[in-house]
A protein has these predicted regions:
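Flexible, surface-exposed loop regions and adjacent strand-edge segments
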Residues: 34, 230-233, 316-319, 471-476, ...
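Conserved active-site loop/cleft motifs that coordinate metal ions or position small ligands
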Residues: 101, 658-661, 695-701
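Short beta-strands and strand-coil junctions in structured, solvent-facing domains, enriched
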Residues: 25, 76, 85-86, 104, ...
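A glycine-rich phosphate-binding loop feature that marks nucleotide/adenosyl-phosphate handling sites
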Residues: 200, 286-293, 366-368, 494-500, ...
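Extended beta-strand-rich architecture
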Residues: 374-383, 387-405, 484, 494, ...
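Gram-negative/organellar outer-membrane beta-barrel architecture
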Residues: 35-40, 55, 60-72, 76-83, ...
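Interaction-mediating elements
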Residues: 1-353, 367-374, 383, 410, ...
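A short, conserved beta-to-alpha structural element at the edge of catalytic cores
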Residues: 146, 683-701
Length: 724
């Protein structure tokens, strides 16, 4: 804006204002962006066509684009900008000129200054180190690399995982992780000087290949000196009682001083007090360096509070989920002692519902002495999903999936779009080269306001992958009740009514493999009772915990139907972490079962047990463990089976794990025949990769003990499924 003054002939003062409109952006263009589209880069900036033109804003956006490239591993990227103004219409075109510079691939990460970590391991050297390395209390370069997200480039694999590219923000976070690692091993004065970190490009023919050299000076290792307590006067909180926690976290005299273990100790003692209602108890650790010994003496000071009781429950943020759905998950009730331990259990239960993005439980002050409210703050999450998926396996071939789920369903509340009651609803359809499936499921987790779940499943499956000689269709409905009967043990009572159709049966297997009575349609009316205890830390990739399940089925007889059988099956799994480096995990999985017909009826072919393939005996073809028909080599199955598998896996780098395994099992024709003389066994190696939230498994299995009929040499098993 410009202003001019003038005086007319009459002596009046005239002021003229000239308004110059601010330039507006006519278009935003990108040049040189070979690896990322303009639409993708536009999401990173604030300048857009039609917005006011700001040179400061454009410069800021150029920096944002450069930061985005660096985040994606293009650390040599350069971004400049230019503005082409049009004086006539007051517009300007913004052009971002990008020199991507190629991505930097990390060839080696080298540690200097600490002799223990200077030895380097290649890709296969890491595997050997993980599997056959000595169990030492000290650490080496593999342990440091396990702490870092930054990793070396591995052909093919790095293209899938995006590991091996240099990303500045990740690397800076990794340096802090290394400092923390050393401090937690007692090296409180460790020096990792950013100015001494070197980025070397030794190969002139490959300018994007880089070595990282990190200089580490550990300095003195501190150990725990004398441990004492102060202020713990309440009965039941003696020095001897609290010393149990000190011992648990390895902070007794002579052990390495670890700041993170000290923090855990503080939290544990505070929670121990809070478990008995002493909610406001303050716990702090005083560190006193001992000049004479070079150790750190610890004084655990406790400022004890009064005992508090729970007054009321205050829920905030549940705009969609009913309050009663939240309250029924709580392990605390008004009038009880305010137990911090049970408060944490309640918080975990609410998180496990997956109804909320954020869940926070905390004590809240009241104006009543020794009374506190329980404040529950939640942030509603997205519980409905429409997912499309694709999968492939050596058994089922290619499969496409579409699924609609609502994890917080409410069939009676259309005003909130059928959400908020904590019910489960799912519709799933799959179509593939060898199988098709449709399933509709509903579950009410609290029937009559009791912790008793009711559910119903309607389904239809068509399968051709069981055999090349026949096809199978199942159409059915299952109703079930499920209840937690003790801590993590739950019982499930189910009734299933199913129609099974065996069709397209090849003439070669009629009668000798599949009895004529089993061909065509048959109904199954079955009651099942099962017990399950599951303590795994993850359903997708478990690293610790157990899973125990017992299943009993009875079909026919007074339940009617055309199938009379009794079946019992037991399943067990155990996962245990062994060493921290590489996040190594050992697992044992076993299954066994038997089925028998009654009332003069045999067990139908489609209800027998089978073993073999990528889901159990990985060194054998699908279903080829047990007796085969001598003419067609079609598996006959059996009425008794047992199977066990041992697997040891180690993380090479996130998200790739390497595994070695051993499988053993048998299938016997008769019911209740656990004679293992005809067992088969195999061993092998494999990889586990978590991509886009779904596991990919690649296994090579080699038969160890096999019969003449099923020794087909090495077996390749592959499976992968995801949603997008």
């Amino acid at each position: 804006m410009d202003a001019k003054r003038s005086v007319d002939s009459a002596g009046n003062l005239d002021i003229d204002f000239t308004v110059i409109p601010k330039y507006r952006v006519s278009q935003v263009a990108f040049s040189g962006n070979n690896n990322f589209s303009g639409a993708r880069l536009q999401k990173e900036i604030d300048t857009y066509a039609g917005s006011p033109l700001s040179e400061v804003g454009v410069k800021r956006d150029a920096d944002k684009i450069k930061a985005y490239y660096q985040k994606k591993g293009y650390s040599l990227a350069k971004v400049s900008h230019s503005i082409e103004r049009n004086e006539e219409d007051g517009s300007g075109a913004v052009i971002f000129e990008i020199d991507e510079g190629g991505d930097i691939e990390i060839q080696n990460i080298i540690f200097k200054g600490d002799p223990r970590v200077e030895k380097q391991y290649g890709f296969w050297g890491k595997i050997g180190r993980f599997l056959f390395g000595e169990d030492s209390k000290d650490f080496d370069s593999v342990d440091l690399l396990s702490e870092m997200k930054t990793d070396t480039w591995i052909p093919i694999i790095s293209h899938l995982t995006d590991n091996g590219r240099f990303k500045e923000d990740e690397f800076q976070a990794d340096i802090e992780k290394l400092r923390k690692f050393y401090r937690d091993h007692g090296y409180l004065d460790v020096e990792i000087d950013d100015s001494k970190i070197k980025f070397e490009f030794p190969d002139t023919d490959s300018p994007g290949d880089m070595d990282i050299v990190i200089d580490i000076v550990p300095n003195h290792q501190y150990k725990v000196g004398k441990v004492s307590f102060k202020g713990n006067t309440i009965k039941g909180f003696s020095d001897e009682e609290l010393m149990k926690f000190v011992d648990y976290f390895n902070l007794t005299e002579g052990n390495v001083f670890s700041p993170s273990q000290v923090d855990k100790l503080i939290d544990q003692i505070r929670e121990y007090y809070g478990q008995y209602g002493y909610v406001d108890t303050i716990v702090r650790v005083l560190r006193r360096p001992n000049v004479k010994t070079g150790d750190i003496d610890i004084v655990i000071e406790v400022i004890e509070s009064k005992m508090f009781y729970l007054e009321s429950i205050n829920i905030q943020g549940n705009s969609k989920t009913k309050s009663e759905v939240i309250i029924r998950e709580l392990a605390l009730e008004p009038g009880e002692v305010f137990d911090l331990h049970r408060m944490k259990i309640s918080e975990n239960r609410l998180k496990e519902t997956r109804f909320f993005d954020e869940v926070t439980l905390s004590p809240e002050e009241t104006n009543i002495p020794q009374r506190k409210n329980l404040k529950i703050a939640v942030k509603e999450g997205r519980t409905g999903n429409l997912t499309f998926g694709a999968g492939f396996s050596t058994v089922e071939s290619l499969v496409a999936t579409v699924e609609i789920t609502q994890g917080n369903f409410d069939y009676s509340n259309y005003k909130s779009y059928f959400q908020g009651a904590g019910q489960k609803f799912r519709i799933r359809g799959t179509i593939g080269l060898k199988s098709n499936q449709v399933i509709i499921s509903f579950e009410e987790p609290w029937v009559f306001n009791r912790e008793l779940a009711y559910g119903i499943d309607l389904y239809r499956t068509d399968s051709d992958y069981y055999s090349d000689y026949y096809s199978e269709m199942r159409l059915g409905v299952t109703n079930f009740l499920r209840k937690r009967i003790y801590e993590r043990i739950e019982a499930r009572l189910a009734y299933k009514l199913e129609l099974v159709d065996i069709y397209n049966v090849d003439r070669e297997i009629r009668g000798n493999v599949i009895p004529e009575s089993d061909i065509g349609t048959r109904t199954i009316s079955q009651v099942s009772l099962s017990f399950l205890r599951d303590t795994r830390d993850s359903y997708m990739v478990p690293t610790r915990g157990t899973r125990l399940e017992l299943i009993q089925d009875v079909a026919g007889g007074p339940l009617l139907g055309q199938t009379n059988l009794y079946r019992i099956e037991a399943r067990a799994g155990w996962w245990v972490p062994t060493f921290d480096f590489g996040k190594q995990v050992f697992s044992l999985v076993g299954r066994t079962g038997a089925v028998q017909g009654y009332g003069g009826k045999e067990v139908p072919y489609f209800e027998r047990f089978f073993l073999g393939g990528g889901y159990n005996m990985r060194g054998f073809k699908y279903r080829k463990v047990g007796k085969l028909d001598p003419t067609t080599e079609e598996p006959l199955g059996g009425n008794t089976f047992a199977f066990a598998s041992a697997e040891y896996s180690v993380e090479l780098f996130n998200p790739v794990r390497f595994a070695v395994f051993y499988d053993i099992g048998f299938v016997n024709s008769d019911s209740w025949d656990w004679d293992p003389s005809d067992y088969c066994s195999d061993f092998g190696v494999g990889f586990r990769v978590l991509l886009m939230g779904a596991p990919m498994r690649i296994d090579l299995g080699f038969p160890l003990k096999a019969g003449d009929h099923n020794d087909d040499g090495m077996q390749f098993n592959f499976s992968f499924g995801t949603v997008f």
